[in-house]
Structure formats: structure tokens, C-alpha cells
Amino acid sequence: MRRRARELAMRALFAHTVGGMGLEEAFQHALEEMGGEEEGYAEPLDQEGVAFARRLLSGYKAHQEEVDRVLEETVEGWDFRQMAKTDLAVLRLAVYEMLYEPTPFEPLIEVAVKIANRYGGEHSGSFVNGVLARVYRRVAAGELKTVAKEA
């Protein structure tokens, strides 16, 4: 269910960024789109999933400056304007989660790659994986601080 919640958050952030909608309006729009059964999912998103998606979005917005700075420092040779907006939305939420949520790194990165593959272009999954692996190396080297992770 968390993967689907992350997809909801990504779709809302994408609509907010690209469509110029307010964040709450974008969230409601994405929630309505995902309200029914969707390809690859047997059940609609539950309230816990909706709450988790909201937490990711509000957390990213609260830490947007720091998350974007980390991404800019990590993504070499890319400007946010050049990046596919789906990839950017996935990366922003994943980096927020890496730094500020207790989710373990490996499943978080794995799900981000799957979402990028589903919504992005041909090379989105490998691009997202490479960027998040570099963020992880920065964390492991002590360059970036994170909250304690769940076991």
C-alpha cells in the first residue's frame, strides 16, 4: 500500500509542478484519479495510504529548499529544467523520505525506481536509481544527516 501512496504523492507533486495547481487541489485531483481500482492494484488506496501520501507531500514542501539543494549537489550535469518532470517529482519525494522519514533506504529506493519506470521514460528507472544511490553514498559517508531508520 505504501508504493501506491508514494505514487499518489508523486502524481500530486507532478500536477502541482507542471499544472500550476495548488498543492491541495493537485492532491485531490490525483486522489480522484487513483480512487478506483487501477492497473496492477487489487484494492483502492486506504486512509492510511492517503495519510502517508499527504505526509510525504507536506514534508517535502516543508523541506523543499534542503531537498532541492541536496538534489542539485548530487545530480551532476543536469538542471531541473532539463529533467523529466516525472523523474524530478519521484526524486524530490524519495530524497525527502531518505532524509526525514524512518523508511529503510533499500525498499525506498526500489519503490522509487519502480514508480519512475511506470510513469517516466525509457531510462527513468536507471536515472532515478543512480541519483538515489549517490544520495545514499553521501549519507553513508556522513556528508548528509538523516533520521534514524526502521530496522
UniProtKB/Swiss-Prot annotation:
<keyword id="KW-0804">Transcription</keyword>
<dbReference type="GO" id="GO:0031564">
    <property type="term" value="P:transcription antitermination"/>
</dbReference>
<dbReference type="GO" id="GO:0003723">
    <property type="term" value="F:RNA binding"/>
</dbReference>
<comment type="function">
    <text>Involved in transcription antitermination. Required for transcription of ribosomal RNA (rRNA) genes. Binds specifically to the boxA antiterminator sequence of the ribosomal RNA (rrn) operons.</text>
</comment>
<comment type="similarity">
    <text>Belongs to the NusB family.</text>
</comment>
<dbReference type="InterPro" id="IPR006027">
    <property type="entry name" value="NusB_RsmB_TIM44"/>
</dbReference>
<dbReference type="InterPro" id="IPR035926">
    <property type="entry name" value="NusB-like_sf"/>
</dbReference>
<keyword id="KW-0694">RNA-binding</keyword>
<keyword id="KW-0805">Transcription regulation</keyword>
<dbReference type="InterPro" id="IPR011605">
    <property type="entry name" value="NusB_fam"/>
</dbReference>
<protein>
    <recommendedName>
        <fullName>Transcription antitermination protein NusB</fullName>
    </recommendedName>
</protein>
<dbReference type="Pfam" id="PF01029">
    <property type="entry name" value="NusB"/>
</dbReference>
<keyword id="KW-0889">Transcription antitermination</keyword>
<dbReference type="GO" id="GO:0006353">
    <property type="term" value="P:DNA-templated transcription termination"/>
</dbReference>
<dbReference type="GO" id="GO:0005829">
    <property type="term" value="C:cytosol"/>
</dbReference>
